[in-house]
């Protein structure tokens, strides 16, 4: 997704914490 991951610091699929879990 367009949101930046808060943990990894890269573009996430969902954004925020959710992205970190998916990655």
UniProtKB/Swiss-Prot annotation:
The keyword Transcription regulation does not apply. Binds 4 Cu cations per monomer. One of its GO terms (biological process) is lignin catabolic process. The keyword Metal-binding applies. Its EC number is 1.10.3.2. It is an enzyme of class 1 (oxidoreductase). Optimum pH is 3.0 with ABTS as substrate, activity decreases sharply as pH increases, and no activity is seen at pH 7.0. Optimum pH is 4.0 with syringic acid as substrate, 5.0 with caffeic acid, syringaldazine, vanillic acid or catechol as substrate, and 6.0 with levodihydroxyphenylalanine as substrate. Inactive after 3 hours incubation at pH 2.0, retains 20% of its activity after 24 hours at pH 3.0 and 90% of its activity after 24 hours at pH 9.0. Keywords: Copper, Lignin degradation, Metal-binding, Oxidoreductase, Secreted. GO terms for molecular function: hydroquinone:oxygen oxidoreductase activity; metal ion binding. Strongly inhibited by sodium azide, sodium cyanide, Li(+), Sn(+), Hg(2+), and the disulfide-reducing agents beta-mercaptoethanol, dithiothreitol and thioglycolic acid. Moderately inhibited by Mn(2+) and Fe(2+), inhibition by these metal ions is stronger at 0.1 mM than at 1 mM. Moderately inhibited by Cu(2+). GO terms for cellular component: extracellular region. Its main location: secreted. Lignin degradation and detoxification of lignin-derived products. Demethylates eucalyptus hard wood lignin. Has high activity against the non-phenolic heterocyclic compound ABTS, and lower activity against the phenolic substrates syringic acid, caffeic acid, syringaldazine, vanillic acid, catechol and levodihydroxyphenylalanine. On the 2D-gel the determined pI of this protein is: 4, its MW is: 64 kDa. This is Laccase-1.
């Amino acid at each position: 997704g367009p949101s930046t991951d808060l943990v990894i610091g890269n573009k996430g699929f969902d954004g925020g914490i959710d992205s970190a879990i998916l990655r």
